[in-house]
Amino acid sequence: MNVNSSSNRGEAILAALKTQFPGAVLDEERQTPEQVTITVKINLLPDVVQYLYYQHDGWLPVLFGNDERTLNGHYAVYYALSMEGAEKCWIVVKALVDADSREFPSVTPRVPAAVWGEREIRDMYGLIPVGLPDQRRLVLPDDWPEDMHPLRKDAMDYRLRPEPTTDSETYPFINEGNSDARVIPVGPLHITSDEPGHFRLFVDGEQIVDADYRLFYVHRGMEKLAETRMGYNEVTFLSDRVCGICGFAHSVAYTNSVENALGIEVPQRAHTIRSILLEVERLHSHLLNLGLSCHFVGFDTGFMQFFRVREKSMTMAELLIGSRKTYGLNLIGGVRRDILKEQRLQTLKLVREMRADVSELVEMLLATPNMEQRTQGIGILDRQIARDLRFDHPYADYGNIPKTLFTFTGGDVFSRVMVRVKETFDSLAMLEFALDNMPDTPLLTEGFSYKPHAFALGFVEAPRGEDVHWSMLGDNQKLFRWRCRAATYANWPVLRYMLRGNTVSDAPLIIGSLDPCYSCTDRVTLVDVRKRQSKTVPYKEIERYGIDRNRSPLK
């Protein structure tokens, strides 16, 4: 892609990097003025990522592998860093991995945020991150054959059903705290679950000393499906269905990645419509979580009232695109449908109604003593940079829509609740502004041509955090590689640190405060480190104990 060098961001960072590590950068390729990919010597990969991460305020939202043997004879690993300092940009660090040895130096000992991504690369490609501290599988089940790696480009017979390699679960859960702690397994299955997950809490009496968890029980293989069976625009509708709550955010991130790779200029009206639907999605997600927060502290009147108001956001979505879920609107280059005058006026009416309703509910919520008592000081996550991609890397129409960045310094469950409250009101204000200031342009850019093996990032600040997609185009009207990283993927690894030092009754509140995409898991096994005993109890008992704090299931 041709990029005007005068507007390129990150040049000073790259110059400093080349001075620090002479000869480390083998190649440099611009995707957009804000995005650049550098290929580095593989032995210097940890040094380069560590330098960008710690010395230039880097953030590591996603890393992934790619089977590029048909392109250059190698595998490749990519570490995408969002630079959060004075010069905000994206720097993707790439290293080529020998196809025979399949080894590359692990970055995790230098940057712990890389651990899940490197475990996934090992599972899906069979690459070996040398020095990776956590050697457990991440995605593949215990009975998966050692020599089968789903995302390789090798010919695979999808009718093949390999024999299980083991009849029992062999996954070792890790307790970094008191080795004698009681263990509480939570999950992995529940009849109402949308996605299973297995939690294990290590407790000493009522106190959680550590936690571990295993997910990916229902890995859907969406990335492989997109690469093998779907065209570019068909993947747009697949990305809608990555998540039941923030599907539109994923759809925007995917289309944005392809548009960035090809240099497609999306019409301004399409950008505005995308922003409107993203804020509608944020509304119904935040209202859902606020309702659940009420439930977890025993305030079920608030739970029902927040869900009542949430229905209006679903009605808003149906009014704008014909569906209560924000599906089917995006295309590469723009959107499929316009927002007409009557729809706009009815939506503005709903915005005014919702503002009054939410104001009343928040006043009632904050007047409930149990809310602050139960949520303040628990589930603390150390304060870091206040990040929001709508501000740090504006996309869609967020560079033009007035908005406010809300921060609370507690880092606890109460702070996360209050951020959602403030963002709910801000989303309503953003909707009013966008609906009143829609530009008069076309909806879709057409007539562009696809360029094989062009690639770029796309990103969205979803209600739970950032969704980051990376797309490399193929030469057969299909994607060569699609990496789809949901917000919760980055939220899970920090959960164990948020649970430590809190009580079992706090666990549902802490987990729920992340608003994770996971199931209502069924059972919890308690392992007492002192008595060296384990006990399995239904998760509903843990949830009930968190609400009324009577009749401890640990006794």
UniProtKB/Swiss-Prot annotation:
Domain of life, source organism: Bacteria
Co-factor requirement: [4Fe-4S] cluster
Keywords, sorted A to Z: 4Fe-4S, Iron, Iron-sulfur, Metal-binding, NAD, Oxidoreductase
Pfam families on file: Complex1_30kDa, Complex1_49kDa, NiFeSe_Hases
Record's signal peptide: none
GO biological process: anaerobic electron transport chain; anaerobic respiration; formate oxidation; glucose catabolic process
Entry annotated with the keyword DNA repair: no
Cofactor details (free text): Binds 1 [4Fe-4S] cluster.
MF-aspect GO terms: 4 iron, 4 sulfur cluster binding; metal cluster binding; NAD binding; NADH dehydrogenase (ubiquinone) activity; nickel cation binding; quinone binding
Major enzyme class: oxidoreductase
InterPro entries associated with the record: ComplexI_49kDa-like, NADH_Q_OxRdtase_suD, NADH_quin_OxRdtase_su_C/D-like, NADH_UbQ_OxRdtase_30kDa_su, NADH_UbQ_OxRdtase_49kDa_CS, Ni-dep_hyd_lsu, NiFe-Hase_large
Keyword Cell membrane among record annotations: no
GO cellular component, one term: formate dehydrogenase complex
The protein's Enzyme Commission number: 1.-.-.-
The protein's role, per its UniProt record: Possible component of hydrogenase 4.
Family: Belongs to the complex I 49 kDa subunit family.
Protein name from the UniProt record: Hydrogenase-4 component G
Species of provenance: Escherichia coli (strain K12)
